[in-house]
C-alpha cells in the first residue's frame, strides 16, 4: 500500500478541499476509492478559465449545476467563482 492510500477518506477530502473543484474532480479517475471523494469536500472553488470559455457563461453555469447535483446533501463551507 502506498502512503496516500493509507490516509483516511477524511484526510484526503481535506487535502482535496484546497484544490480548484475541477482539479479535485480529476482525481476521481485514480481508483474506485477516489471516484466520489471530491464530492465530499466542503469547499467549491470554480475557475472559469478551466472551462475554456471567455467570461462567465453558460458553460460555467452548467458546470456549477453538475457539481452542486453531486454534492447536494453536503454543507458547503466555502463557495468561490473566479471568472
From Swiss-Prot:
Pfam families for the chain: F-box (PF00646)
Residues covered by the F-box domain: 4-37
Matching InterPro entries: F-box-like_dom_sf, F-box_AtFBL13-like, F-box_dom, FBL60-like
Highest taxon of the lineage: Eukaryota
Protein name: F-box protein At1g19070
Lineage, top ranks: Eukaryota, Viridiplantae, Streptophyta, Embryophyta, Tracheophyta
